[in-house]
């Protein structure tokens, strides 16, 4: 996570937002899962939801967490209890667009492509999505207050085990 401290909402610049995303996706691609929850506020919303549900206004999600504590629990489950074949993920985000401001924070949107590689198989696309985020200044740095990942297909592979 970036060590640059930010002390005012006006500091939510395009460069600061881009640095946040670079750090976020780098952390995930490097499988530093224990660092992932720190990108979120204590009270946050993290949701991975099919496009059909999102557009209909339904909240039924494939994955959802409503606090940093819930995100930490997910990491614990991934690192200590779940069994799955070894794999690598690479995330390919587009540049984020600022689409609005809300309560001192900034709403952004960007596309995301997620590619999975199993050690003994060719790489495959496992997710095509649009990310709707609310970024705020919290404890002197940028964090996600909301991260809603809307994936295009109606189903995700069972193999999508890591955060997006």
List each model region and its residues.
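Short, low-complexity N-terminal intrinsically disordered segments enriched in polar/charged residues
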Residues: 1-30, 38-42, 49
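Short helix-to-loop capping/linker segments positioned immediately adjacent to catalytic or ligand/cofactor-binding
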Residues: 24-25, 79-86, 119-122
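A beta-strand edge to alpha-helix "cap/lid" segment located at domain peripheries
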Residues: 5, 92, 97-164
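A generic "alpha-helical surface" signal
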Residues: 15-19, 27, 62, 69, ...
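Hydrophobic pocket/interface hotspot
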Residues: 24, 36, 71, 135
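A solvent-exposed, acidic/Ser-Thr-rich amphipathic alpha-helical stretch
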Residues: 42-111
């Amino acid at each position: 996570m970036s060590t640059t401290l930010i002390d005012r909402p006006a500091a939510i610049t395009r460069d600061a937002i881009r640095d946040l995303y670079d750090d976020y996706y780098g952390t995930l691609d490097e499988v530093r899962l224990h660092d992932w929850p720190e990108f979120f506020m204590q009270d946050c919303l993290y949701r991975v939801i099919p496009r059909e549900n999102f557009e209909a206004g339904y909240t039924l999600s494939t994955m959802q967490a409503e606090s940093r504590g819930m995100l930490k629990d997910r990491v614990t489950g991934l690192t200590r209890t779940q069994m799955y074949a070894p794999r690598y993920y690479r995330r390919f985000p587009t540049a984020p667009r600022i689409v609005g401001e809300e309560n001192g924070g900034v709403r952004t949107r960007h596309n995301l492509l997620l590619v999975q590689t199993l050690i003994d198989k060719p790489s495959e696309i496992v997710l095509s999505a649009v990310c709707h985020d609310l970024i705020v200044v919290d404890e002197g740095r940028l964090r996600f207050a909301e991260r809603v990942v809307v994936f295009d297909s109606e189903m995700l592979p069972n193999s999508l085990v890591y955060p997006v």
